């Protein structure tokens, strides 16, 4: 075995030892108040420290927006940093009682118009909607290597979807379901020249097409990598690959993206998935893929172009790395990319400048690797400070490791130098971590957030289900300083820290906004001015109720419909004062929706229950809030 192979390969005994250690750590850590942290059990209070101030005084504003995923809760959460105050939740894949997301016509259109035809058929007897989502990996759009404030994209692992949030109004305006692909795990966006593509990893292989006819034929199973056009929210192209895909990132030159693979064995069981001592990173050549699509060198499957990127393809290269790599993260220097080992104590550092030669077959795959430092047990994700330092989460060690990229390269070249600068205990078992602006060329090296999977003893006991623990860390000095614990509900998988200067939301809606354009068009057809008129339009057994709302009164004190009518209520908030949001709730009908200033919202339902049903404003918008109400009168059939 060559020295190069010795550097790279994870000894089978080491791998099994690491795996056993991980299992033991999970068993101890999940059950008790103590956790594995550098090999010692540390009480929570022993870790309290006073670092740089994270205090944001009353009336002052945070320096950063932090966009958190929520995993199985299905929403985006907006937190301010460094205060770590939660400011807003954006419902996306979930049903939201507060805002009516998933019930209003506007939100249902977003949630359904991008579904695959077979999914629409599948959901016909289930209300027409998926009622769950597993939202991971929120990432904003880029222009020239930094955030441009237009959009935020995220994936739904549970139902193979991708969403887009408009950052001017902080609302989801597009959701699409990916054909051919089964699950979406890693998601990142094109950094240069702009977004551009949204890259989506297919984690699990299934037969393509997945119609139940070839389930026993392993050769029919394929994992799929997808590029979505971030402007049109349509699939631009897909690439079939060998092995499962995990996480993904892109370069700063607009030439390549790259994904980790943790199941090169293409196994169906845990033992099968861990059988090999090596997996790989897949590198995608965007120019070659685009040229092939333009020339028609693809198969159309599920209505989209699909290219064959399996081993030997001109579109991809496979670089061997130690077993089960997880995160892959591009450094702000535009040169280095780090794949994190997970089952190996190492991370693998690539130099993107070598990728051209790799695709031109001038060098071997492992020649793109320039460092492979050993950092600790369970490296999952790496963040950067823009000063040449990297910060890697060590899941099993419950630590964040600060290390220097150039020193790691020197050590890989044979020099006796230790790249590790500092290790900090975190609480407990960290997954993702992110630095302020650290995923852009403008990394500022101020803050790091460690998203920890277990909180254990850090908070008052709230029962068997515990919060996660997101910890704010000051990285402005030579050593990291833990300054704040922040509990979060299930379950953030990722976060992005964006300087507030990059985001510029509106305070009130623009009346020309496309979000409620369908309501405007219907009102025009009914000769209704939404900003003025409050009227009832009957069209057979379909009734359209239009009303304005201006605190503290709705435009209609009551309206009458017949039992069995299909009723659509349109409410337009004509208040122009910022933060004067109204709500519209019909008692005992299960109807509630948000109506923000200058917005129109609508909801459609069947008036199946006769009688008197009051509607009222659910937002406290006025001193006469309790009086802001009216009656829906439902005439009984035959009355």
UniProtKB/Swiss-Prot annotation:
EC numbers on record: 1.7.2.4
Region (COX2-like): 541-639
Signal peptide as annotated in the record: 1-46
Positions that bind Cu cation Z4: 493
Assigned keywords, A-Z: Calcium, Copper, Metal-binding, Oxidoreductase, Periplasm, Plasmid, Signal
This protein's GO CC annotations: membrane; periplasmic space
Binding positions (Cu cation Z2): 136, 185
Residue numbers binding Ca(2+) 2: 262, 265, 273, 279, 324
Positions that bind Cu cation Z3: 137, 432
Catalytic activity annotation: N2 + 2 Fe(III)-[cytochrome c] + H2O = nitrous oxide + 2 Fe(II)-[cytochrome c] + 2 H(+)
Name the record gives this protein: Nitrous-oxide reductase
């Amino acid at each position: 075995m060559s020295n190069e192979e010795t550097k790279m390969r994870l000894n089978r005994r080491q791998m099994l030892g690491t795996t056993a250690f991980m299992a033991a750590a999970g068993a101890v850590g999940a059950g008790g108040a103590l956790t594995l942290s550098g090999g010692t059990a540390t009480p929570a209070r022993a870790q309290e420290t006073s670092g740089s101030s994270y205090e944001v005084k009353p009336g002052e504003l945070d320096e950063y927006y932090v966009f958190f995923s929520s995993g199985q809760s299905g929403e985006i959460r907006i937190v301010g940093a460094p205060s770590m105050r939660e400011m807003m939740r954006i419902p996306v894949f979930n049903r939201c009682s507060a805002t009516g997301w998933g019930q209003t016509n506007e939100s249902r259109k977003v949630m359904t118009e991008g579904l695959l035809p077979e999914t629409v058929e599948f959901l016909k007897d289930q209300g027409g909607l998926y009622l769950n989502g597993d939202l991971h990996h929120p990432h904003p759009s880029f222009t020239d290597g930094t955030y441009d404030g237009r959009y935020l994209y995220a994936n739904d692992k549970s139902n193979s979807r991708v969403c887009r949030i408009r950052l001017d109004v902080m609302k989801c305006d597009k959701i699409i379901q990916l054909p051919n692909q089964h699950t979406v795990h890693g998601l990142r966006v094109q950094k240069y020249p702009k977004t551009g593509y949204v890259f989506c990893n297919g984690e699990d292989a299934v037969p393509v097409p997945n119609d139940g006819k070839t389930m026993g034929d392993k050769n029919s199973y394929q994992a799929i990598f997808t590029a979505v056009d971030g402007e049109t929210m349509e699939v631009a192209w897909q690439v079939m690959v060998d092995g499962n895909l995990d996480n993904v990132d892109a370069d700063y030159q607009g030439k390549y993206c790259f994904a980790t693979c943790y199941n090169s064995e293409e196994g169906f069981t845990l033992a099968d998935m861990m059988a090999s001592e090596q997996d790989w990173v897949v590198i995608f050549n965007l120019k070659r893929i685009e040229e092939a699509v333009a020339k028609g060198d693809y198969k159309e499957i599920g209505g989209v172009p699909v290219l064959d990127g399996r081993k030997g393809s001109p579109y991809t290269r496979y670089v061997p790395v130690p077993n089960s790599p997880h995160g892959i993260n591009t450094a702000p220097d535009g040169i280095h990319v780090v794949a994190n080992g997970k089952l190996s104590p190492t991370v693998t550092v690539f130099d993107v400048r070598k990728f051209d030669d790799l695709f031109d077959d001038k060098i071997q795959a492992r020649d793109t690797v320039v460092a492979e430092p050993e950092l600790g047990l369970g490296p999952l994700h790496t963040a950067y400070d823009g000063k040449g330092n990297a910060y890697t989460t060590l899941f099993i060690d419950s630590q964040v490791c600060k290390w220097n990229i150039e020193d790691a390269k020197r050590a890989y070249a044979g020099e006796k130098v230790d790249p590790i600068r500092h290790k900090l205990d975190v609480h407990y078992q960290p997954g993702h971590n992110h630095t302020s602006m650290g995923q852009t060329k403008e990394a500022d090296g101020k803050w790091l957030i460690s998203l920890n999977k277990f909180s254990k003893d850090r908070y008052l006991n709230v029962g068997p289900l515990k919060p996660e623990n997101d910890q704010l860390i000051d990285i402005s000095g030579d050593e990291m300083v833990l300054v704040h614990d922040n509990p979060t509900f299930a379950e953030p998988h990722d976060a992005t820290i964006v300087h507030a200067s990059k985001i510029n939301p509106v305070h009130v809606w623009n009346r020309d906004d496309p979000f409620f354009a369908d309501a405007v068009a219907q009102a025009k057809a009914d000769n209704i001015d939404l900003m003025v008129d409050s009227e009832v339009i009957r069209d057979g057994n379909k009734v359209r109720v239009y009303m304005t709302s201006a605190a503290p009164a709705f435009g209609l004190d009551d309206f009458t419909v017949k039992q069995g009518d299909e009723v659509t209520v349109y409410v337009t908030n004509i208040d122009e004062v910022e933060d004067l949001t109204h709500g519209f709730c019909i008692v005992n009908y299960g109807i509630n929706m948000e109506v923000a200033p200058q917005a129109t919202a609508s909801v459609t339902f069947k008036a199946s229950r006769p009688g008197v049903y009051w509607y009222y404003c659910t937002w406290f918008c006025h001193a006469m809030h309790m009086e802001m109400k009216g009656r829906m009168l439902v005439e009984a059939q035959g009355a």
